[in-house]
């Protein structure tokens, strides 16, 4: 049997996954070429995925010369470490996503990890009803308020440059209209600065090329509800 070739970068991903989209946006921002490998999540998972992430059996997984790196935020951090900027190259893509200052970097990691709650609580909105949904709504609004406050009046979470926290949060934006509908709230009202930030980010090439329209996300949620037998 011929030996399997594992050279360069391969991203094991699923088209609508916001966690995989974090990796796609980061790769685009840094101008790093890679191969995309679409994975099946609702059916039988590929042997490659199971071998690459035997613990969680989830995407995204980044294969670098055949060696797997799992979990989206760990992948983002890895890309910064493995593909450091070249001082001799002047390019907007020749950049670090994380701040070089240790404290600023720690804060960025905190807020990026905290943003996972948007997806977690949003999922509870469309899965649950009644009091449980109301609780998820209240918690999600609190998370959005915290993110809005952390952003403040800055253009991006790191200041003037699109960076680590922006990459972590922006893939959740196409999911927000569905969350608004199930939770009966408005992001524009609850977190106006965050809503304005989302509109600014939408025009970035890396973001526009990685995310899907909210309508496609809503169709996917509807499909998931049918798959799990949720009325």
What do the PLM-derived regions correspond to, one by one?
Residues 1-157, 161, 227-228:
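GST-like domain detector, emphasizing the conserved glutathione-binding G-site
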Residues 51, 203, 212:
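Phosphate-coordinating loops and pocket residues in cytosolic domains that bind phosphorylated ligands
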Residues 159-182, 186, 190-196:
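GST superfamily/GST-like fold recognition
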Residues 213-231:
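Acidic/histidine-enriched, glycine/proline-rich intrinsically disordered or flexible terminal extensions
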Residues 135-139, 188-203:
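Extended, well-ordered alpha-helical scaffold segments
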Residues 126-130, 186, 220:
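Charge-dense, low-complexity polyampholytic segments
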Residues 91-97, 209-218:
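Short, flexible loop/turn segments with low-complexity composition
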Residues 149-160, 182-183, 205-211:
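Surface-exposed helix-capping loop/turn segments at secondary-structure junctions
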């Amino acid at each position: 049997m011929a030996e399997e070739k594992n050279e360069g970068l391969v991203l094991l991903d699923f088209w609508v996954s916001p966690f995989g989209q974090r990796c796609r946006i980061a790769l685009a921002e840094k101008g790093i070429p890679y191969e995309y490998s679409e994975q099946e999540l609702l059916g039988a998972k590929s042997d490659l995925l199971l071998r690459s992430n035997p613990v969680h059996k989830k995407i995204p997984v980044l294969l670098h010369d055949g060696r797997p790196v799992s979990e989206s935020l760990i992948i983002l951090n890895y890309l910064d470490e493995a593909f450091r900027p070249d001082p001799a190259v002047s390019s907007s893509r020749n950049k670090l996503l994380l701040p070089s200052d240790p404290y600023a970097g720690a804060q960025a990691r905190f807020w990026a990890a905290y943003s996972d709650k948007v997806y977690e609580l949003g999922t509870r909105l469309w899965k649950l009803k009644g009091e449980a949904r109301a609780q998820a709504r209240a918690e999600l609004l609190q998370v959005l308020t915290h993110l809005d406050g952390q952003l403040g009046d800055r253009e991006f979470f790191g200041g003037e440059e699109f960076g680590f926290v922006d990459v972590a949060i922006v893939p959740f934006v196409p999911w927000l209209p569905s969350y608004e509908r199930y939770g009966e709230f408005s992001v524009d009202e609850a977190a106006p600065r965050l809503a304005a930030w989302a509109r600014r980010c939408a025009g970035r090439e890396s973001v526009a090329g990685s995310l899907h329209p909210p309508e496609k996300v809503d169709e996917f949620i509807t499909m998931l509800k049918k798959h799990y037998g949720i009325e």
